[in-house]
Amino acid sequence: MNKYNLKGYHDWNPAVEEYYDWYAKGRYPNNEEGRAHYLGQVHYMDKEIGLLLDLLEEQGLRENTLIFFISDNGGSTPIYANNKPLRGSKYLLYEGGIRVQMLVSYPKKYEKGKVYQNMVSAMDILPSICKEANIKIPDYIDGMDLTPLLKGVNDSLKHDVLVWDTGHELAVRKGPWKLRKSFNDSEAKYEMVELELGNFITNLNTDIGEKINLIKKEPVILGDLEKEYSVWKSKLEKGDNKK
C-alpha cells in the first residue's frame, strides 16, 4: 500500500474475536442465528457492490464497463446457504454445488433484463473479455466467447458438453442428461450433507433435484456420457508430476 501512497490499516487484525466466535458456532446445524447471519452477509455484499456501481456512475464509466458477477460454487450448508430446489452444496457435483448464477452487465452493448438458460461456464469469462477488449483469444483457452449470446446475435450459443472432475467425484453434462460418479464422501461429511456413492444418470429437465437414478434404464446415455468424459480427459495436458 505504501508503494501506491495508500493509507494503511495499522490496527487491522484478522483474528477478530467476534468473527472467530461466530465461525465456531457457524458449523453447528441448529444455530438459531445462522440463516439470519448468512442473509445479513449477502445484504452487506449487495450494498458494497452498489457502492462500486455508484462510483462507476459518478466517474462516467458505467455505460462502457463490462461487469461479470458469478459465484465459484453453490452455497455451503454449514454457513446456512440454501440451494433448493437443487440438491447438494459446495464441494459436491450435485447441481447445488456447480449450478450458479452469472450476471453480466454492459449497458453500452448488452440489452438489460434478458434471461438465458444456456449452459455456459466461468471458463467463458476470459475469452468474452478478450473479445470486447479486442485482444486475441489464446488458442489454448477452454472457454468460449459469449458476446454473440450477450448481444442477441446468437441466442442458442452454449456448451454442448461440460465436464467436472474433483478426484472425489466426476460429472458430465450434455443437454438435459447428467452423469455423476461419486467415489468418496469426505467432502460431503465436511458440508454436513448426504452424498450417494456410485454411478448416477439424471434427466435434469424432469428431475432438477437429482432424486431418480436412471442408470439402468438409460445404458445408451451412460455410454455416451462416459465416452465424452474419456475424450475430455484424453485432451488434458499433464504437468511436471505426471501421474
What are these model-derived regions, one by one?
Residues 1-126, 130-141, 182-199, 204-211, ...:
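Active-site-proximal cap/lid insertion segments
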Residues 157-158, 230-243:
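Bilobed periplasmic-binding protein-like "clamshell/Venus-flytrap" ligand-binding domains
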Residues 168-174, 178-181, 188-192:
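Short, surface-exposed beta-strand/loop micro-motifs that present aromatic residues
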Residues 67, 146, 163:
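N-terminal sensory regulatory modules of PAS/LOV and PAS-like folds
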Residues 61-67, 157-159, 174-177:
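Loop/turn elements at helix/coil->beta-strand transitions in domains of secreted/extracellular proteins
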Residues 136-137, 155-158:
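Glycine/proline-rich active-site loop of Rossmann-fold NAD(P)-dependent oxidoreductases
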Residues 90-95, 161-163, 169-170:
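Short Gly/Pro-enriched turn/cap motifs at secondary-structure boundaries
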